[in-house]
Amino acid sequence: MLLKNILSVLAFALLIDAAPVKRSPGFVTLDFNVKRSLVDPDDPTVESKRSPLFLDLDPTKIPVDDTGRNDGVDKRGPVAVKLDNEIITYSADITVGSNNQKLSVIVDTGSSDLWIPDSKAICIPKWRGDRGDFCKNNGSYSPAASSTSKNLNTRFEIKYADGSYAKGNLYQDTVGIGGASVKNQLFANVWSTSAHKGILGIGFQANEATRTPYDNLPISLKKQGIIAKNAYSLFLNSPEASSGQIIFGGIDKAKYSGSLVELPITSDRTLSVGLRSVNVMGRNVNVNAGVLLDSGTTISYFTPSIARSIIYALGGQVHFDSAGNKAYVADCKTSGTVDFQFDKNLKISVPASEFLYQLYYTNGKPYPKCEIRVRESEDNILGDNFMRSAYIVYDLDDKKISMAQVKYTSESNIVAIN
């Protein structure tokens, strides 16, 4: 998902929604409830599970849519969060304030600020179906109800590339996540937004939307001794699975095959690494550029020439809707793999089916072709349709990202990142 803050910083998002279920000496865990809803798959802020996309079009045309603690001497350890498999977002429950006000927020690896809607926030409709207090349907924050709330009297504003935004003031209060309690955490209490949920940004401090840098939540987790390092690992699980997991300060060694390969982060602001090439069922496409690993983006984006090469290698054909909008479609039964070659001979293989999305007419019948979920952009972005095939460790302290081919399993072997 593409976002921009008011300082024109490019950001991207991963989403998470959860409730703490247990706490042990080794780990803090969050379990998530799967919800189903039907929304526009191009809305990066709406909770959009794996529901079918229904199309209002002429039958002959196609549209364009769119964790815990270690028992050893060091008491710091990983904080594990179980993720819902949603078509757009992964969302998680947090608590805010002395009275533990519960909110569901987007956990965003691309942005770096936590913001939540005020209980009196004005919700500005942007997407079809936005009605009433939609921006507060996933919880809101009442500063007056918390004895530990502090208004810093500093304005906050962030704007996303899709045009949605959030405006408010900076506050400090206690934030709870996965059973861990973070004291005096700085965040924005938003009084006007067109987004459907608050966002918990966990990216680089340099990507914060504030003029003055501050300790965002991952940094606070480390400084307050909850985790040993500002790092987290991500397991989105298979397309059919109902949940995945993010672990703050830890790695689940059962969730990948072979060894993790370390790659340097190539940007001072975004979580990007170098990608050499993409091999589409035997046809090689050179990239040789940085690519953002963005769990908050459902599909993948490349600069135009690279995107078109990948699309055509997948058998893409151009179709137009009645308004003249262009879409690339292909046979839904296309098989094989799309192999991503990174530095250090790291290869991540992705089923071709991950890049094909079934379309439906408004009468519920499937369209005979699938949309290719690769699009043209100014930026190279690998979204969820790539990331489900990789186990990814983001180390913000050492500015590196480690990856391996994912292993879909219910087994677990979580160790702390020290």
From Swiss-Prot:
Residues at the active site: D108, D294
Keywords: Aspartyl protease, Cleavage on pair of basic residues, Disulfide bond, Glycoprotein, Hydrolase, Metal-binding, Protease, Secreted, Signal, Virulence, Zinc, Zymogen
E.C. no: 3.4.23.24
Glycosylated residues (UniProt): N138
A GO biological process held by the record: proteolysis
Keyword Protein biosynthesis belongs to the record: no
Binding sites annotated in the UniProt record for pepstatin A: D108, T109, G110, A161, D162, D294, S295, G296, T297, T298
Similarity section: Belongs to the peptidase A1 family.
Function: Secreted aspartic peptidases (SAPs) are a group of ten acidic hydrolases considered as key virulence factors. These enzymes supply the fungus with nutrient amino acids as well as are able to degrade the selected host's proteins involved in the immune defense. Moreover, acts toward human hemoglobin though limited proteolysis to generate a variety of antimicrobial hemocidins, enabling to compete with the other microorganisms of the same physiological niche using the microbicidal peptides generated from the host protein.
Domain of life, per lineage: Eukaryota
Stated regulation of activity: Inhibited by pepstatin A analogs.
Protein's recorded name: Secreted aspartic protease 6
